[in-house]
Curated annotation (Swiss-Prot):
InterPro entries: Adaptor_Complx_Large_Subunit, AP2_complex_asu, ARM-like, ARM-type_fold, Clathrin/coatomer_adapt-like_N, Clathrin_a-adaptin_app_sub_C, Clathrin_a/b/g-adaptin_app_Ig, Clathrin_app_Ig-like_sf. Its main location: membrane. Pfam families: Adaptin_N (PF01602), Alpha_adaptin_C (PF02296), Alpha_adaptinC2 (PF02883). Adaptor protein complex 2 (AP-2) is a heterotetramer composed of two large adaptins (alpha-type and beta-type subunits), a medium adaptin (mu-type subunit AP50) and a small adaptin (sigma-type subunit AP17). This is AP-2 complex subunit alpha. GO terms for biological process: asymmetric cell division; clathrin-dependent endocytosis; endocytosis; follicle cell of egg chamber development; intracellular protein transport; mitotic cleavage furrow ingression; positive regulation of autophagy; positive regulation of endocytosis. Keywords: Cell membrane, Coated pit, Endocytosis, Membrane, Phosphoprotein, Protein transport, Transport. It is found in: Cell membrane; Membrane, Coated pit. The modification Phosphoserine is found at residues 632, 634. The lineage of its organism: Eukaryota, Metazoa, Ecdysozoa, Arthropoda, Hexapoda.
Length: 940
C-alpha cells in the first residue's frame, strides 16, 4: 500500500496506538526498542528517504523522547527538514530542534544558518517558524546570533504585520535572557513608534516589549509616554475610530488598554507636560464615566473586560497620587463594588482601596466605607476577602477611628480563621500603640489580645507592652493592677503569665497596699501558675520571686522555700536548678542594701520605633501599606533567645554588659514621613532542601552566609542573597565525600554565564582532592540546578576549598566567593570507648606535640545540652559516663585519610561560674590537634 501523503501520518498513528495498548512497562520498552531499530535502519539504509518519511520518523523520535526515553540519533534528519519548502516538514524540524537540541550540540551552526535563511525568506510562514524557534530556545547564543536580524524585521517597512508581531515577542523573550542585545540610539525611537501601528497584534506585542525595556532603562524610552497616552485616548474616546473594530464584548481593545495603562505606571510623575497630563486625566475620567454606564451586555465577558480596564486605570490614578478629583472618584467607584455579587470584584475593590487609604487626598473618602468593610470582615464567606477587609481596616485607621477599629478587630478575633489570627494580632498591636492617646487603653488592648488569642501573640508583642510600661511611669500602677486581675482567671495563657510575672516583679509594690493584692497574695497567685508553664516561663517567674524578696521582705521565707525545692534534684531542668540555687544564696548572703542594688528597678529602654512593623511586613510583604512601614534607625531588635535572657536575668543588673542585641523592642517615636526601605522584609527560602539589588557586582551585604554552622551538620542553606540561594547536601564515608550543591534562582529573570569555579591550589589538592562537575551556563528564573562534587582526603589539612560563583543578572556581572563545608572533621569515624580505655589512651597522648588546648569565653550563656548536640554533629563519638564530672564532654574518633588513620580524643570542660570553656584535643599527629582545636574554639 502506498504511504498516505499529506499531513496525516498513518505510521505514527499506528505506533502511538501500539504504545497505548501496551499492558506493561516491559511491553512498552520492547515496542519502543523495535521502533528505534526500524528508524535507525531507515536512516542508515541505502534508500533515500523523502521529506514525508523523514517527517514521520522524526515525529516518532519526538514522541519517544516525550515518553521519557533518551534519543541519540535523528538530529541531522531533523536539521535537513529545515531546508524543506513544505510547511508541515519545516514545522516538524523546528519542533524537534526546539525540544531536543541543546546549545552545545555540534549541529548548532547548521541550525543557526538554516534559521538565518528562513529569516531572509519572503514567505512569512517560514519567517514566523524561525522566530518561534529562536524564542523557544531563547539561549544566549541565539540572542548573539540574531541580535541584528530581529530588530531589523521589527522596524522594517517591508515586513508583514504578522512577522512584526512575532519579531516583537521574540525580541522580548531574548531581552529577558540577554538584556544587552537590544540596540540603542536610533533604534529606540523606531521601536517606540510601533505604538502607533494600526495592526492590533503588532501594537500589543510592541507594548509588552516596550514595557520590559522601560523597566530597565526608563530615561531612554521616556518618549513612549506621549505616544501611549495618545493611543490610549484614541481607544477609549468614542469620537475616535482607532481600533474600534477590535472590540471584545463592546469594550474596545481591552488587553491593549490594560498594557498601555501598565506601561504608564513605570513613570512617576507620568509626564511633566501639561497638555499630555490633561489628556491623560481626560482619558482616565472617560474610563471612570464608562464604568457608571449601564452594561451593554449581561455576559460575564463584558463585565470582565470592562472592569479589567477600570481597575488598571485606578491603579494608574493611585500610582500618580496627584489628582484629588480622580482619587475621590476612584474611591467612590470602588465603594460600589464592595456590595457587588461577584466575590472577585469585592476582593479587588478592597485591595485597591488599601492603596487609596494611604493617599492624603482619598484617605477620608475611604473612611466613609468603614461600616461596609467591617461587615465584610465579619460576614464574607471567602477567607481571602475577609483577610483583605482586615488589611483595609488597618490601612484606613487613624486617631479618629482607631479605638472603634481596634475593638471591632478584637471582637472578630475570637472567631477569626486560624490562618489570619497571627497577622491580625500584629496589626491590632501596631494600631493600639501607634494611635494610643491613653496608655491604659493600650495595656487593656494587649492583655485582651493575649486573653483572646494567646497562642498567636508573638514574643515581639508582649516584649513591647513590657517596654512601654517600663518607659511610662503613669501607666505602671494600672498595668500592675490589670495583669493581677487577669491572672486570677482559672485558665490563663502562658504569655499572660510572662507579662504578669515581669510587671509584678517590677511594680507589684504599687498595688500591694490593697489587701486583695497583698504581697503574699501576688506571690501565691503567680506560683499557682508555675507548674503549668514551660521551663522558660518558670525561669522568668524565679526572677520575679527574687525581685519580690527585695520589694516585700516579709515574704522572704515563703520564697526561699520555693528556691530550696528547685535547687535540689526535684527540678529536672539544670537551668532552673542553677537559677534557684543562685537566687537562694543571694537572698541569704546579701545585705539589704546589696540586694536593693542588684535587684533595682529596670531602667527605661532607649526610645526607638517598634519593629513589630517589620515583623508584619516580613509575614505579608504585599499586604501592608508602604507608608505604614518605617524602618528604625536604631540597632537591630532583640532575638528570641537573647530577649528571654534579658528578661530572666535582670536580677544580675548587667543589662548593659550583655550582647548588643539583648534589649527589648524600642518605644515608637512619632511617625516619620519617610517610607522605610524595609530591609528586614526580604523573605528567605530556608527550606529549599528539607521579595533592590545593589549596582555593585560584589554587593552581598544582605546575603545570608555562614559556613561555621556546617561544622555540625551536612545539609542546609549554605548561602543566600536577593538573587541566589545555594543549598548543600553531603555525605562522607572514611576518606571519601560527596556534595550536592543546589543553585536556586530567586529572581524573575534567568541568570546567564553562570559559572562556579573551584579555588583550590595544586598544593592544597595534594591534601584534599576535589572534583567538580560542570553546570549549565543559564539558570532559568525560579529554577534550580544541581552540581555534584567529590572529595578525597589524602592527608589532614587546615583550610577548606573556596568556590567562586559568577553570573550576569540583568546585564550586570555578579561575583562572590564562599567556602565549601569541607572541614577536616567531615572525615571522622566515631569510635566507641569505655572510661578505662579512653583515659589509658588519653595518658599515652600526653606529649607536647600530641595535644592542643584552648580556654575561651562562652559565645552565649552556657547551654550544655546545646553543646552536646553540636558535638554529636561534629563527627566524633560523644562518650557518656566516661568523665567523672557529668558536665564535661569527651569524644573519640578516627580521621580517615588516604595515607593514614589518625586517632583523636577531645575533652570539653565548662565553667558555669566563669562562663568559659576549656577545650583539649589529643591526637597522634600534631597538625590534627591544632586543626580540630581551631575548628571548635568559640563554637559554644
Amino acid at each position: 500500500m502506498a504511504p498516505v501523503r499529506g499531513d496525516g501520518m498513518r505510521g505514527l498513528a499506528v505506533f502511538i496506538s501500539d504504545i497505548r495498548n501496551c499492558k506493561s512497562k516491559e511491553a512498552e520498552v520492547k515496542r519502543i526498542n523495535k521502533e528505534l531499530a526500524n528508524i535507525r535502519s531507515k536512516f542508515k539504509g541505502d534508500k533515500t528517504l523523502d521529506g514525508y518519511q523523514k517527517k514521520k520518523y522524526v515525529c516518532k523520535l519526538l514522541f519517544i523522547f516525550l515518553l521519557g526515553h533518551d534519543i541519540d540519533f535523528g538530529h541531522m534528519e531533523a536539521v535537513n527538514l529545515l531546508s524543506s519548502n513544505k510547511y508541515s516538514e519545516k514545522q516538524i524540524g523546528y519542533l524537534f530542534i526546539s525540544v531536543l537540541v541543546n546549545t552545545n550540540s555540534d549541529l548548532i551552526r547548521l541550525i543557526i544558518q538554516s534559521i538565518k535563511n528562513d529569516l531572509q525568506s519572503r514567505n512569512p510562514v517560514h519567517v514566523n517558524l524561525a522566530l518561534q524557534c529562536i524564542a523557544n530556545i531563547g539561549s544566549r547564543d541565539m540572542a548573539e546570533s540574531f541580535s541584528n536580524e530581529i530588530p531589523k524585521l521589527l522596524v522594517s517597512g517591508d515586513t508583514m504585520d504578522v512577522v512584526k508581531q512575532s519579531a516583537a515577542l521574540c525580541l522580548l523573550r531574548l531581552f529577558r535572557s540577554s538584556p544587552d542585545i537590544i540596540p540603542g540610539g536610533e533604534w529606540t525611537s523606531r521601536i517606540i513608534h510601533l505604538l502607533n501601528d494600526q495592526h492590533m497584534g503588532v501594537v500589543t506585542a510592541a507594548t509588552s516589549l516596550i514595557d520590559a525595556l522601560v523597566k530597565r532603562n526608563p530615561d531612554e524610552y521616556k518618549g513612549c509616554v506621549n505616544l501611549a497616552v495618545s493611543r490610549l485616548s484614541r481607544i477609549v474616546t468614542a469620537s475616535y475610530t482607532d481600533l474600534q473594530d477590535y472590540t471584545y464584548y463592546f469594550v474596545p481593545a481591552p488587553w491593549l488598554s490594560v498594557k498601555l495603562l501598565r506601561l504608564l505606571q513605570n513613570y512617576n510623575p507620568v509626564t511633566e507636560e501639561a497638555g499630555v497630563r490633561a489628556r491623560l486625566n481626560e482619558t482616565l475620567e472617560t474610563i471612570l464615566n464608562k464604568a457608571q454606564e449601564p452594561p451593554k451586555s449581561k455576559k460575564v465577558q463584558h463585565s470582565n473586560a470592562k472592569n479589567a480596564v477600570l481597575f488598571e486605570a485606578i491603579n494608574l490614578i493611585i500610582h500618580s497620587d496627584s489628582e484629588p478629583n480622580l482619587l475621590v472618584r476612584a474611591c467612590n467607584q470602588l465603594g460600589q463594588f464592595l456590595s457587588n455579587r461577584e466575590t472577585n470584584l469585592r476582593y479587588l475593590a478592597l485591595e485597591s482601596m488599601c492603596h487609596l487609604a494611604t493617599s492624603e487626598f482619598s484617605h477620608e473618602e475611604v473612611k466613609k466605607h468603614q461600616e461596609v468593610v467591617i461587615l465584610s470582615m465579619k460576614m464574607e464567606k471567602d477567607v481571602s476577602v475577609r483577610q483583605m477587609a482586615v488589611d483595609l481596616l488597618y490601612a484606613m485607621c487613624d486617631r479618629g477611628n482607631a479605638e472603634e477599629i481596634v475593638q471591632e478587630m478584637l471582637n472578630y478575633l475570637e472567631t477569626a480563621d486560624y490562618s489570619i489570627r497571627e497577622e491580625m494580632v500584629l496589626k491590632v498591636a501596631i494600631l493600639a500603640e501607634k494611635y494610643a492617646t491613653d496608655y491604659t487603653w493600650y495595656v487593656d488592648v494587649i492583655l485582651n489580645l493575649i486573653r483572646i488569642a494567646g497562642d498567636y501573640v508573638s514574643e515581639e508583642v508582649w516584649y513591647r507592652v513590657i517596654q512601654i510600661v517600663i518607659n511610662r511611669e503613669e501607666v505602671q500602677g494600672y498595668a500592675a493592677k490589670t495583669v493581677f486581675e487577669a491572672l486570677q482567671a482559672p485558665a490563663c495563657h502562658e504569655n499572660m503569665v510572662k507579662v504578669g510575672g515581669y510587671i509584678l516583679g517590677e511594680f507589684g509594690n504599687l498595688i500591694a497596699g490593697d489587701s486583695r493584692s497583698a504581697p503574699l497574695v501576688q506571690f501565691k497567685l503567680l506560683h499557682s501558675k508555675y507548674h503549668l508553664c514551660s521551663p522558660m516561663t518558670r525561669a522568668l517567674l524565679l526572677s520575679t520571686y527574687i525581685k519580690f524578696i527585695n520589694l516585700f521582705p516579709e515574704i522572704r521565707t515563703n520564697i526561699q522555700d520555693v528556691f530550696r525545692q528547685h535547687s535540689n534534684l526535684r527540678s529536672a531542668d539544670a537551668e532552673l536548678q542553677q537559677r534557684a540555687s543562685e537566687y537562694l544564696q543571694l537572698s541569704i548572703v546579701a545585705s539589704t542594701d546589696v540586694l536593693a542594688t542588684v535587684l533595682e528597678e529596670m531602667p527605661s529602654f532607649p526610645e526607638r520605633e517598634s519593629s513589630i512593623l517589620a515583623v508584619l511586613k516580613k509575614k505579608k510583604p504585599g499586604r501592608v501599606p508602604e507608608n505604614e512601614i518605617r524602618e528604625s534607625k536604631s540597632p537591630a531588635p532583640l532575638t528570641s533567645a537573647a530577649q528571654n535572657n534579658a528578661l530572666v536575668n535582670n536580677s544580675h543588673s548587667k543589662l548593659n554588659n550583655s550582647n548588643a542585641n539583648t534589649d527589648l523592642l524600642g518605644l515608637s517615636t512619632p511617625p516619620s514621613n519617610n517610607i522605610g526601605s524595609g530591609s528586614n522584609s526580604n523573605s528567605t527560602l530556608i527550606d529549599v532542601l528539607g521579595d533592590m539589588y545593589g549596582s555593585n557586582s560584589n554587593n552581598n551585604s544582605s546575603a545570608v552566609y555562614n559556613t561555621k554552622k556546617f561544622l555540625f551538620k551536612n545539609n542546609g542553606v549554605l548561602f543566600e542573597n536577593e538573587m541566589l540561594q545555594i543549598g548543600v547536601k553531603s555525605e562522607f564515608r572514611q576518606n571519601l565525600g560527596r556534595l550536592g550543591l543546589f543553585y536556586g534562582n530567586k529572581t524573575q529573570v534567568p541568570l546567564t554565564n553562570f559559572n562556579p569555579v573551584l579555588q583550590w591550589s595544586a598544593e592544597d589538592a595534594l591534601k584534599l582532592n576535589v572534583q567538580m562537575k560542570v553546570v549549565e551556563p543559564t539558570l532559568e528564573a525560579g529554577a534550580q540546578i544541581q552540581q555534584l562534587l567529590t572529595a578525597e582526603c589524602i592527608e589532614d589539612y587546615a583550610d577548606a576549598p573556596t568556590i567562586e560563583i559568577s553570573f550576569r543578572y540583568n546585564g550586570t556581572q555578579q561575583k562572590f566567593s564562599i567556602k565549601l563545608p569541607l572541614s577536616v572533621n567531615k572525615f571522622f569515624e566515631p569510635t566507641e570507648m569505655n572510661a578505662e580505655s579512653f583515659f589509658a589512651r588519653w595518658k599515652n597522648l600526653s606529649g607536647e606535640q600530641q595535644r592542643s588546648q584552648k580556654v575561651f569565653k562562652a559565645a552565649q550563656p552556657l547551654d550544655l545540652p546545646g553543646a552536646r548536640n553540636k558535638l554529636m554533629g561534629f563527627g566524633m563519638q560523644l562518650l557518656d559516663q566516661v568523665d567523672p564530672n557529668p558536665d564535661n564532654m569527651v569524644c573519640a574518633g578516627i580521621i580517615h585519610t588516604q595515607s593514614q588513620q589518625v586517632g583523636c580524643l577531645m575533652r570539653l570542660e565548662p565553667n558555669k561560674q566563669a562562663q568559659m570553656f576549656r577545650l583539649t584535643v589529643r591526637a597522634s599527629k600534631e597538625t590534627v590537634t591544632r586543626e580540630i582545636c581551631d575548628l571548635l574554639t568559640d563554637q559554644f
